Design a protein with these regions (language model features):
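Extended, charged interaction scaffolds in large complex subunits
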Residues: 1-257
Length: 257
């Protein structure tokens, strides 16, 4: 009971969990907009050429300029660059026996270790957008709930949502470019949306529409319902073990859905 009080009271577990939702699940993603605007040029470079310390400085600046500036625990948020893309990271987890909680137990996957490893050439081609991840330094006793295993799941969820947001941003930039190109084409040929230019515009709009709906599904149909169930379980928890179990169920549900 004393440990439970320490986790919930002095450790401010509820506040830290809300922070994890804000940062890793982009519940309030205004800080990410600031960060992408400031760090976009750096993230577009090849991963080996990126300065992580510069990214960390830009992340801290973005937090100060966003609604997260009032979070007393935002100093515990850091960033890193993973050594592989998210697909290969998930494959590595599955192959090495860490797939429990990430994939159905009866998943029909016949993989070997070579399939899960990136070649050196593939790794060199990765950009910062493909390898960027957040990290969180949870102090004792909150680290009992926000364990390294739990934070790894948060990182996987973040990388997935971050990639969706990045692609959405690029599609919006493509739309802006298309507007300028269409205007130039109309002046020179007298045609606006005909031919291949029109088909490219329609395709980009369909892609953008799909991605926006997919992101909405992730946040409103997956994260929010599971989060509400998780909050109920937190209020009813009578021990730290029950807190950990409820947290793991929340993360596993988000990963699977």
């Amino acid at each position: 009971v004393a440990l439970l009080r320490a986790v919930l009271g002095d450790g401010d577990l509820h506040g830290r969990l809300r922070a994890m939702k804000r940062y890793f699940l982009l519940d309030k993603g205004d800080f990410l907009v600031h960060f992408t605007d400031n760090a976009g040029e750096e993230l577009a470079r090849r991963a080996p050429d990126i300065s992580v310390s510069r990214l960390q400085s830009l992340l801290e600046l973005s937090l100060k300029l966003s609604t997260a500036s009032t979070d007393p625990h935002n100093d515990d948020l850091t960033c890193s660059l993973e050594r592989q893309g998210i697909i290969h990271q998930l494959l590595s987890i599955h192959v090495t026996g860490g797939a429990k909680g990430y994939a159905p137990a009866d998943a029909d996957l016949d993989l070997d270790e070579n399939a899960a490893q990136m070649t050196p050439k593939e790794a060199l081609r990765l950009t910062g957008f493909e390898t960027f991840a957040l990290d969180y330094n949870a102090p004792w006793p909150v680290s009992l709930v926000l364990s390294r295993r739990a934070i790894t799941k948060y990182q996987l969820l973040f990388r997935h949502v971050f990639h969706c947001k990045h692609v959405e941003r690029r599609l919006c930039e493509a739309w802006q470019t298309h507007q300028a190109t269409r205007a130039a084409a109309a002046q020179t040929t007298g045609a606006g949306d005909g031919g291949s230019l029109g088909r490219a515009y329609v395709l980009s709009q369909r892609m953008l529409h799909f991605l926006q709906n997919f992101t909405y599904y992730l946040m409103c149909e997956v994260v929010e319902p599971n989060w509400h169930a998780f909050e109920t379980a937190l209020r009813d928890a009578q021990s730290v073990d029950e807190l950990v179990d409820a947290h793991e169920r929340f993360l596993d549900a988000c990963m699977k859905e």
